[in-house]
């Protein structure tokens, strides 16, 4: 048995982060070679050695604005909220979403379920950053990620925060290094940026950047994993909170890797207004509507990178539930399918076992009465190459499935599952009803290996 354990821990992993942190060739395509970053934001990634085994890689991220920001965040609903979650919520509440200057993040230790001492550690991290910024009031959001139930090596972190502050920069390399600093079992840093315009200022260009981490313990409930977004657009705090909540509900709250909701889940956004223009404040304004679409689309792209880096994952799966009487029922059904171990393992095995999908639909809890009617439910696979859908079930009646074509479809990395609650031709034409989309990955042997020796 001991020999077997040594063999497992020494084996070559195809999908998890290599010991030298080199980005796998298959994931290189997700790494941006340049970016359009918001004005007035500076970032750095610094090595601390939070985990003793980490002797050289960055594990402390610092994101700072040269001017005070409006800020908003959504946090985990896990009852065991980590110390940084509790501290950051208090900071945002006391500041009413105004005057925030920085976000500091350590990887390697979650600082969760660590008692009074853990709370003191989280406070001290934020306070140290504030001191570096010459501030006396709490103005920093704190995040941590890693192993639960262990105290931070807080002295090491506090000693390196001034170094992180000195190294702040606005270059693409700095942003990429910062994104790498928040990774744990991730195989690649997740960083995106884009420019946009608003209806009130068509000649003014704004920028939006975001980084996220996560590969396991991913299933949302108000927020998921860690994410930081920054924009130089001017947005009032109350509007920023509603914009983020909407965006997260349709992005970070619509992904699943393994069905576990972390103790540390936090997604935050900072808006410093450095690009000028009139502040976005009223939900009735054209600028608000445009910003909602921009932020939601951006958050979806960012959150999908987490699924593509799911621990041991070999597939990126979109499940689209359409023709539902309401959005929430469609979302619940999509979520149930996405977290079904039987669905996920069938996809890994390239098995077109649509009965597992139907089973998940049938046991979904909380949907509106009359949402799921077997006689009008249809399920199909939609290939990524644009070829016709492969019908599996139509109006509750099984189709004669072309197993050979199904196998070809399931060999692809990307796949879409379409569930039509209205049935048949009506659903295919997209007539009527609400639609929800969820993104998830498969379960492989590698997932068990990664999580079986996570702490070692």
Curated annotation (Swiss-Prot):
CDD domains: OAT. Substrate binds at residues 184, 213, 224, 311, 451, 456. Transmembrane segments: none annotated. The keyword Protease does not apply. The alpha and beta chains are autoproteolytically processed from a single precursor protein within the mitochondrion. GO terms for molecular function: glutamate N-acetyltransferase activity; L-glutamate N-acetyltransferase activity. Pfam families: ArgJ. The keyword Mitochondrion applies. The record marks 223-224 as: Cleavage. Heterodimer of an alpha and a beta chain. This is Arginine biosynthesis bifunctional protein ArgJ, mitochondrial. It comes from Neosartorya fischeri (strain ATCC 1020 / DSM 3700 / CBS 544.65 / FGSC A1164 / JCM 1740 / NRRL 181 / WB 181) (Aspergillus fischerianus).
């Amino acid at each position: 048995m001991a020999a077997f354990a040594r063999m497992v821990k020494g084996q070559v992993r195809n999908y998890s982060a290599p010991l030298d942190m080199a980005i796998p060739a298959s994931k290189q395509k997700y790494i941006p070679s340049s970016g359009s970053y918001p004005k007035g934001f500076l970032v750095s990634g610094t090595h601390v050695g939070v985990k003793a085994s980490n002797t050289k890689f960055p594990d402390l991220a610092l994101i700072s604005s040269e001017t005070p920001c409006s800020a908003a965040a959504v946090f985990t609903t896990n009852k065991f909220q980590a110390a940084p979650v509790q501290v950051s919520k208090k900071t945002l509440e006391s500041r009413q979403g105004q005057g925030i200057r920085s976000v500091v993040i350590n990887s390697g230790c979650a600082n969760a379920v660590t008692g009074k001492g853990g709370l003191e550690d989280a406070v001290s991290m934020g306070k140290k950053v504030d001191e570096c910024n010459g501030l006396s009031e709490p103005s920093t959001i704190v995040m941590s990620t890693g192993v639960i139930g262990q105290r931070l090596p807080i002295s090491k972190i506090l000693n390196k925060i001034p170094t992180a502050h000195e190294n702040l920069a606005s270059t693409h390399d700095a942003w990429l290094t910062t994104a790498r600093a928040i990774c744990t079992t991730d195989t690649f840093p997740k960083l995106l940026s884009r420019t946009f315009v608003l209806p009130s200022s068509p000649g003014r260009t704004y920028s939006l950047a975001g980084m996220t981490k996560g590969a396991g313990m991913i299933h949302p409930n108000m927020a998921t994993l860690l994410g930081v977004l920054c924009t130089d657009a001017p947005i009032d705090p109350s509007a920023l909170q509603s914009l983020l909540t909407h965006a997260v509900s349709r992005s970070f709250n619509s992904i699943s890797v393994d069905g576990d909701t972390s103790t540390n889940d936090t997604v935050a956004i900072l808006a410093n207004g450095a690009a000028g223009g009139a502040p976005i404040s009223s939900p009735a304004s054209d600028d608000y509507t445009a910003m909602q679409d921009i932020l939601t689309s951006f958050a979806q792209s960012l959150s999908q990178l987490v699924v593509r880096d799911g621990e041991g994952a070999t597939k990126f799966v979109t499940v689209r539930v359409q023709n539902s009487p309401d959005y929430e029922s469609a979302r619940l059904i999509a979520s149930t399918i996405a977290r079904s171990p039987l669905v996920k393992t069938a996809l890994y095995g390239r098995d077109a076992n649509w009965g597992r999908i139907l089973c998940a639909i049938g046991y979904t809890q909380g949907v509106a009465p009359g949402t799921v009617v077997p006689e009008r439910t249809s399920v199909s696979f939609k290939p990524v190459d644009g070829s016709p859908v492969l019908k599996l079930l139509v109006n509750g009646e099984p189709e004669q499935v072309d197993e050979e074509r199904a196998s070809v479809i399931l060999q692809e990395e990307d796949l879409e599952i379409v569930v039509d609650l209205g049935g048949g031709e009506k659903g295919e034409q997209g007539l009527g009803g609400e639609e929800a989309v969820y993104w998830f990955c498969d379960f492989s042997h590698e997932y068990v290996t990664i999580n079986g020796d996570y702490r070692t």
